[in-house]
Amino acid sequence: MKRLYGVIGNPIGHSLSPVMHNDAFEHLKMDAHYHAFLVKEEVLGEAVRGLKALGISGFNVTTPHKVAIMDYLDEIDPLAKQIGAVNTVVHKDGKLIGYNTDGIGFVRALQSISSEPLQEKRILLLGAGGASRAIYFSLADAGVKEIDVANRTVDKAKELIAACTATVHSVALSLEKATKEQGNYDIIIQTTTIGMHPRVEHTPLQISSLKKGTIVSDIIYNPFETKILCEAKEQGAIIQNGIDMFVYQGALAFEMWTGCVPNIERMKQLVIRKLGG
């Protein structure tokens, strides 16, 4: 019997997840289908109960349901609980279990371009929103010991740092101070929407004095190269856009659902083609 997977969100028509997962199913000769479900906020509970009743094997959760979904699940993974958001649900033994693969997916994506263990790196996170929180907690969970957080509102950065129970040395910075101290970091991670299409001329941090070999990663992938990545490349940095995070978090969800590891490079090239790259 064909297994059913999917993604719920609103809007959902733009999602690249169905293309990516269905290609992986076909490539691995698996009898499965991944579908995008438009689910409005006021019917989220009914939709989740309906998916469970239909016997869906697993599904992703995107905007605006990542927090609200937690009220309708049977179990939540400890890391997802700490992050406060779920983006992947596994249906196992009659239970819906929530996970967060965003942060772990990002960590795996970052490791894929780093020649050295991340645990030894000094990291600067730009932003203190939901994406930053997932990445911060996942980096801490992976054993990274130095993670500073820069945000327009410094108090929000302080709140993010205070919420983490892991042993991490962290300082909350203003964006102005982070700009001055950018040369002290091995990795800079841009987690805000600043620089996303159509406001491509904006950047949260003017890149001017990076040290050699710095990695600059931006979770945005439209455009492929944001202003911060362009400036970092001019400084000789190793750059990474958000496609890697999207692919790795999806691949991790696929692995959780099926027990099979998909071809990451195949997934990545498919997404790039679909985005017109």
UniProtKB/Swiss-Prot annotation:
It catalyses: shikimate + NADP(+) = 3-dehydroshikimate + NADPH + H(+). Pathway: Metabolic intermediate biosynthesis; chorismate biosynthesis; chorismate from D-erythrose 4-phosphate and phosphoenolpyruvate: step 4/7. Pfam families: SDH_C, Shikimate_DH, Shikimate_dh_N. InterPro entries: Aminoacid_DH-like_N_sf, NAD(P)-bd_dom_sf, SDH_C, Shikimate_DH, Shikimate_DH-bd_N, Shikimate_DH_fam, Shikm_DH/Glu-tRNA_Rdtase. Shikimate binds at S15, L16, S17, T62, N87, D102, Y221. Its EC number is 1.1.1.25. Keywords: Amino-acid biosynthesis, Aromatic amino acid biosynthesis, NADP, Oxidoreductase. One of its GO terms (molecular function) is NADP binding. One of its GO terms (cellular component) is cytosol. The keyword Isomerase does not apply. The active site is at K66 (proton acceptor). Belongs to the shikimate dehydrogenase family. Homodimer. This is Shikimate dehydrogenase (NADP(+)).
